[in-house]
Regions:
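Conserved alpha-helical substructure of the radical SAM core
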Residues: 2-135
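Residues within alpha-helical segments
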Residues: 38, 148, 161-164
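Alpha-helix N-cap and loop-to-helix initiation/capping positions
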Residues: 58-61, 65, 151-159
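Short, conserved SAM-binding segment of the class I
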Residues: 72, 103, 159-167
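Short beta-strands and strand-loop turn motifs
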Residues: 81-85, 140, 176-179
Length: 185
């Protein structure tokens, strides 16, 4: 077999294949890490596919177990570039949420949470901020009657709105509101 120079067409094809292959091999940086810290929830939302309830069939994930995961992430990634999002169930069901948040923050990870706001009080919000809370997402699924129907609790709209107001009053605090659009909203 004779070594003939590759044609321009073949060289271009090989270069394209090499670049595509290199792109496939590049590591995609981790940007967000979700921690479902509990399966317990204080509401019974009609749209939720979770089997969360006030008393879960499984215990909450121990904080130490999640911190080990963060240690392994920090070994290969800059923690300041990975945002930890605490979800559930309802994260505010955890009595040690502030302790968990502080431990996450102390490891260099910014963190936020997704909440229905039912258990958010001014004092709890202050403690969460002191624990390094960067952001929060609050669920609000329509006006009072629709939201309360969707969430299965007559106080859920009022408490969610109060949580949103607290967050809006905090200078520089970043939060958002998510809505599950349905035929009642």
């Amino acid at each position: 077999m004779k070594n003939e120079p590759l044609t321009l067409r073949h060289r271009i094809g090989l270069e394209i294949a090499r670049k595509l292959n290199n792109d496939l091999l590049k590591e995609h940086p981790l940007k967000q890490l979700f921690w479902e810290c509990t399966l317990r929830c204080n509401l019974h939302c009609r749209h939720c596919g979770s089997d969360c309830k006030k008393i879960a069939g499984h215990p909450d994930m121990p904080k130490e177990d999640f911190l080990k995961v963060l240690d392994s992430v920090a070994a290969s990634t800059d923690p300041h570039k990975v945002f930890v999002i605490i979800t559930g169930g309802e994260p505010l069901m955890r009595e040690d949420l502030e302790e968990c948040g502080k431990a996450i923050y102390d490891k260099g990870f910014p963190w936020g949470m997704v909440t229905n706001g039912l258990y958010m009080t001014r004092e709890r919000f202050r403690r969460l901020l002191a624990s390094g809370l960067h952001t929060a997402t609050v669920s609000l699924d329509g006006f009072a009657a629709d939201h309360n129907w969707m969430r299965g609790n007559p106080q859920s709209f009022e408490r969610a709105v109060e949580a949103i107001k607290m967050m809006a009053e905090e200078p520089g605090f970043v939060f958002d509101v998510v809505t599950c659009v349905n035929k009642h909203s």
